[in-house]
Amino acid sequence: DFDYKVEAHYEGCNNGLLQIDITRNELDVQRLETDYKALFDMPEMQSFPYTLDVFQKKTFHLEKHLSDLKLPNKQKLEFLQKDFGKFTFTFYFAKNSISDTKGEGDVERFPYKPISADRKKWLKQNVGVKIFRDNFRVRPYGEYGNDWLRLGDRYTTNPSGAGQRLGGYYIRRNQIVGAVEISRLDSKKLEDKSSREGLQENDVFDLFKEVLIGIIELFEKDRNHVMYYLSQLYDKNNPKGKTRREAENATRTGFSQENYQKIVAGYNTIKQQLDEKEDELSLLRNL
């Protein structure tokens, strides 16, 4: 029971390619084929991997050079990528609840699949990204409270939902279950600390973490793209819902003249809808 699964394999600098399989499992494909079919008429949803046939297959494949990833310092990659050797990184993205935001109309905006009642318990027991070297667990990575990839810090810089805007969407630290597999033979510069508790904090390990974040960002980009254009489709079909959502966002981002106008528009929309509901109730009372 998961929303996304990402499997990344790197065979070392001789090959130089990341082989990545991304499986989408968050949205109801049957509803995409019917109720949300207009999504695939959008120009932004007419190229790989966003076409309907790719959603129907669920899993798609990417090949990327490490240099294709979004890395803070690509010059460092040229000198150090050979030092961390082969690795495999597999992770699952899973929300705690059917929707990961509390905005009005969120469930109508996105055709979510139902989730298992046991998911929250499973997440609590397994959350985090663990490291295994030659099939043995390397602690403390992935233990409760050990956010060694600093996913929580990334999220706090921009805690917006995946459908709110393009770019800047980040996974939450409590939404990922993953494992990194390395070997002592291929990853000689990823060395144990003298205490045997963790790996030495050196340039190679820093780069390795940046590469893992770069792989996570491939998932984030995909989910952000899909959810953003689903949100655009909903706003096109529900302009009052868009006005309310803009007002909600404006209340969180501080005062400006533009935000003031959005809040006023949102207030007027809500008042109009309440008046319409009151008229409906009056008619029912008079029946």
Can you annotate each of these PLM segments?
Residues 1-128, 132-144, 191:
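Interdomain "switch/hinge" adjacent to the Bergerat
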Residues 13, 17, 86, 104-106, ...:
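Intrinsically disordered, low-complexity regions
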Residues 205, 209-287:
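Signal-transmission coiled-coils
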Residues 40, 149-162, 246, 250, ...:
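Charged, glycine/proline-rich intrinsically disordered loops and linkers
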Residues 8, 38, 94, 117, ...:
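A sequence-composition feature that detects small, non-aromatic residues
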Residues 116, 124-228:
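GHKL/Bergerat-fold ATPase module
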Residues 47, 67, 97-99, 116, ...:
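Generic serine detector
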Residues 14-15, 25, 73, 96, ...:
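Detector for Asparagine
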